[in-house]
């Protein structure tokens, strides 16, 4: 019987690393001269969203820059962030909600499957919930499928996990 190899394509964010990045960003905001006396803060409660609050749009943009730099240093891909619109908040402040993308949405999963099928690589790709499973007889074909997915323009960060031989 021939062995079947497979792997999963997933999109996930390490919430502990996000928490660490938020804490580092808060520490920098507290110590920076241009934020002295400011109402700028970052709220993250282990939900897949971060709330940014600041005095005005300019300081909010600076808070975003600080947060993004800390996320990059912690290994979080910025494609995993979805920015909401800037809205007015209480006390002459502005607020913006940043959502963290977890899982692969159906339309993006279909795009991945289509890209793999269009490449004519001898593998099967199927959507399974919020991930895509790719299976095939040859490991080299799986490597080609990984390269196809890496070459596809996606709006989310993807990881290749759960390699196995059945």
Curated annotation (Swiss-Prot):
One of its GO terms (cellular component) is cytosol. The keyword S-adenosyl-L-methionine does not apply. Gene3D superfamilies: 3.30.70.860, YajQ-like, domain 2. Disulfide bonds: none annotated. One of its GO terms (molecular function) is nucleotide binding. Keywords: Nucleotide-binding. Nucleotide-binding protein. Belongs to the YajQ family. This is Nucleotide-binding protein Dred_1927. It comes from Desulforamulus reducens (strain ATCC BAA-1160 / DSM 100696 / MI-1).
């Amino acid at each position: 019987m021939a062995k079947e190899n497979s792997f999963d394509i997933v999109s996930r964010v390490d919430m502990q690393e996000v928490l660490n990045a938020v804490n580092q960003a808060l520490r920098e905001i507290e110590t920076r001269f241009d934020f002295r006396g400011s109402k700028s803060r970052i709220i993250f409660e282990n939900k897949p969203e971060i709330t940014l609050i600041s005095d005005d749009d300019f300081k909010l943009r600076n808070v975003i820059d600080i947060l993004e730099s800390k996320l990059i240093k912690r290994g979080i891909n910025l494609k995993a962030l979805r920015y909401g619109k800037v809205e007015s908040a209480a006390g002459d402040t502005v607020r913006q909600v940043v959502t963290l993308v977890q899982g692969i949405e159906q339309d993006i999963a279909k795009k991945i499957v289509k890209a793999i099928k269009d490449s004519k690589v001898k593998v099967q790709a199927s959507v399974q919930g919020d991930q895509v499973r790719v299976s095939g007889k040859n490991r080299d074909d799986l490597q080609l499928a990984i390269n196809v997915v890496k070459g596809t323009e996606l709006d989310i960060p993807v990881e290749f996990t759960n390699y196995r031989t059945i």
